[in-house]
């Protein structure tokens, strides 16, 4: 039997200078915990069963009203479990970032297990002077158990619009049975990747602050001129100013541990009082 797709809703508004959840309707398999963090709102995603079980479907609409400050993270890696009957696990998140609002979407990696099928769609709309930071993070299975690119299919899509105009449309599909993931044109010996998108007017103070930190971290972790090629292969990345509204980082690595320091340093920067005012990864190992 195909599971019904039930539409979940989150609304975040500013009340007396503080961002709070003012409306929610959440259905299985999704769980969301709301944490109070000074003037910002911190929402933590989780799942019943610790991940996506065959056929699970999440359809979530997020409305972050004007002047709100919100962070979305996860309890742990998002695991996609084995599909015994060829059913797809699917996640669709449609979000609005209101005027002068800030949203930081910073979850842990998606980890597709052997024989799993996963499809993800992230759609965000930005209003005037809104800022959005999105992290899209992936690891190719239970690497420590020797499982690597053993899933059946993985698809992810991110689309961002600003004032009704698309400024990001990023799509990526992996089908290991049809493609050689160890090819130099794919992952070679890497098993993890991370994409970071910063969207918002480049003249905004928040955008300048986050972009400066991203450039600093890119200079620290990525190298344009490599002397020792064997060392360079553990992590490869690039930082690109796409246009006046988008700054982007792409990075792949041999394993997730090599990407953790980059993300943790970025999360720590979010504790600036002009941004979130707290670290969404605080307390992590």
Swiss-Prot record:
Molecular function GO labels: nickel cation binding
Keywords, sorted A to Z: Chaperone, Cytoplasm, Nickel insertion
Predominant subcellular localization, coarse grouping: cytoplasm
Assigned GO CC terms: cytoplasm
UniProt entry tagged with the keyword Zinc-finger: no
Compartments, as annotated in UniProt: Cytoplasm
Top-rank taxon, per record: Bacteria
Subunit structure: UreD, UreF and UreG form a complex that acts as a GTP-hydrolysis-dependent molecular chaperone, activating the urease apoprotein by helping to assemble the nickel containing metallocenter of UreC. The UreE protein probably delivers the nickel.
Functional description taken from the UniProt entry: Required for maturation of urease via the functional incorporation of the urease nickel metallocenter.
Family: Belongs to the UreD family.
Protein name as it appears in the record: Urease accessory protein UreD
Gene source species: Cytophaga hutchinsonii (strain ATCC 33406 / DSM 1761 / CIP 103989 / NBRC 15051 / NCIMB 9469 / D465)
Taxon lineage: Bacteria, Pseudomonadati, Bacteroidota, Cytophagia, Cytophagales
């Amino acid at each position: 039997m195909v599971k019904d797709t039930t539409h979940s809703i989150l609304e975040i508004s500013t009340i007396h200078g503080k961002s709070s959840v003012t409306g929610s309707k959440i259905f299985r398999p999704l769980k969301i915990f709301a944490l109070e963090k000074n003037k910002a709102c911190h929402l933590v995603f989780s799942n019943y069963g610790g991940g996506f079980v065959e056929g699970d479907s999440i359809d979530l609409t997020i409305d972050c009203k004007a002047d709100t400050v919100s962070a979305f993270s996860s309890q742990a890696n998002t695991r996609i479990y084995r599909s015994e009957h060829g059913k797809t696990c699917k996640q669709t998140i449609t979000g609005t970032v209101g005027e002068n609002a800030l949203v930081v979407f910073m979850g842990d990696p998606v980890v597709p297990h052997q024989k799993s099928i996963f499809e993800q769609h992230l759609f965000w709309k930005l209003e005037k002077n809104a800022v959005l930071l999105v992290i899209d993070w992936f690891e190719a299975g239970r690497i420590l158990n020797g499982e690597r690119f053993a899933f059946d299919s993985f698809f992810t899509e991110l689309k961002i619009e600003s004032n009704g105009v698309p400024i990001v449309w990023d799509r990526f599909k992996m089908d290991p049975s049809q493609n050689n993931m160890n090819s130099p044109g794919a992952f070679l010996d890497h098993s993890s990747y991370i994409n970071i998108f910063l969207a918002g007017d480049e003249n905004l103070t928040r955008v300048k602050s986050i972009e400066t930190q991203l450039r600093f971290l890119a200079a620290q972790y990525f190298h344009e001129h490599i002397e020792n090629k064997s060392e360079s292969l553990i992590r490869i990345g690039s930082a690109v100013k796409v246009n006046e509204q988008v700054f982007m980082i792409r990075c792949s690595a041999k394993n997730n541990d090599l990407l953790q320091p980059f993300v943790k340093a970025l999360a720590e920067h979010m504790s600036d009082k002009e941004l979130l005012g707290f670290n969404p990864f605080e307390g992590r190992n």
